[in-house]
Regions:
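A generic structural signal for ordered secondary structure
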Residues: 10-14, 29, 63-65
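Short, surface-exposed beta-strand/strand-loop-strand elements in extracellular ectodomains
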Residues: 26-43, 77
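Noncatalytic modules at the cell exterior or secretory-pathway interfaces
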Residues: 20-25, 56-72
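Beta-sandwich interaction modules
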Residues: 14-15, 47-59
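Surface-exposed loop/edge segments in extracytoplasmic proteins
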Residues: 2-3, 39-47
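Surface-exposed ligand/attachment interfaces on beta-rich extracellular proteins
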Residues: 2-21
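Low-complexity intrinsically disordered segments
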Residues: 4-5, 74-78
Length: 78
């Protein structure tokens, strides 16, 4: 398990897990989330989540960015 950390995320995709970790992700704001072994492209299909908590487990390689209508979002990961 990783230490609890907080991040501000914008429109650029950021990797949260690499497919080997189980994490708890709290999202504040509206986020696009996808599973990809490499950095997704601009038009990548994604699930939209708002103000929620996700349990992410292997083999999911989680990427996240703020939704198109949102400025920045805040996530807390542990």
């Amino acid at each position: 398990m990783m230490a609890t950390t907080a991040k501000t995320i914008g429109r650029d995709w950021e990797q949260i897990t690499d497919g080997t970790q189980s994490v708890l992700v709290q999202i504040t704001g509206s986020a696009d989330v996808c599973d990809s072994p490499v950095k997704p492209g601009e038009e990548q299909a994604a699930h939209c989540f708002s103000n929620t908590v996700l349990n992410v487990s292997p083999p999911t390689a989680m990427w996240i960015r703020s939704s198109w209508f949102e400025g920045n979002i805040r996530i807390v990961v542990s």
